From Swiss-Prot:
Listed GO CC annotations: chloroplast; small ribosomal subunit
Compartment(s): Plastid, Chloroplast
Membership in a protein family: Belongs to the universal ribosomal protein uS7 family.
Key words, A-Z: Chloroplast, Plastid, Ribonucleoprotein, Ribosomal protein, RNA-binding, rRNA-binding
NCBIfam families linked to this entry: rpsG_bact
Biological process, per Gene Ontology: translation
Gene responsible for this protein: rps7
Coiled-coil blocks: none
Signal sequence extent: none
Gene3D superfamilies reported in the protein's UniProt record: Ribosomal protein S7 domain
Protein name listed in UniProt: Small ribosomal subunit protein uS7c
GO molecular function: rRNA binding; structural constituent of ribosome
Main location class: plastid
Disulphide bond pairs: none
Length: 156
């Protein structure tokens, strides 16, 4: 992290099919080793499966899933007087969205035996219903922040 000046925020251009910045962020996180066309293919196939399963606009389901997995608070370690405290902090909206996408994709990558599009579809549908492992991760983070709210006075 530079001490001189803050980095400018890059503007994410929306994806070509759904014209959504959220889908583009999902594709960028999904991409491995620069294979963006493969990431697009996986994402769009997953969204088609979501549309078939729910008979709704897949963009609405994806937005709902990411919103349900987005954390409101997180804990960061802060060292004060020789001891380390887990200090709860509010999460900025962009960071919350990035964390939600990262958690959804990490859950998909941990599962084995099915194609990535099928795993992503299942996790998006689960997260949209407010269940699934990504939402459970968010709940664990919230519980940890709630347990350590006595240390909120040590916020940065």
């Amino acid at each position: 992290m530079s001490r001189r000046r803050t980095q400018k925020k890059r503007i994410v251009m929306p994806d070509p099919v759904y014209d959504s910045r959220l889908v583009e962020l999902l594709v960028r996180q999904l991409m491995r080793e620069g294979k963006k066309s493969l990431a697009y293919r996986i994402c769009y196939e997953s969204m088609n499966r979501v549309a078939d399963a729910t008979q709704q606009d897949p963009l609405v389901i994806v937005e709902q899933a990411i919103r349900n997995a987005t954390p409101l608070v997180e804990v960061k370690a802060r060292r004060i007087g020789g001891s380390t405290y887990q200090v709860p902090l509010e999460v900025a909206s962009e960071r919350g969205t990035a964390l939600a996408i990262r958690w959804i994709l990490s859950v998909c990558r941990k599962k084995t035996g099915r194609p990535m599009a099928a795993k992503l579809t299942a996790e998006l549908l689960d997260a949209a219903k407010n269940s699934g492992l990504a939402v459970r991760k968010r709940d664990e983070i919230h519980k940890m922040a709630d347990a350590n709210k006595a240390f909120a006075k040590y916020r940065f």
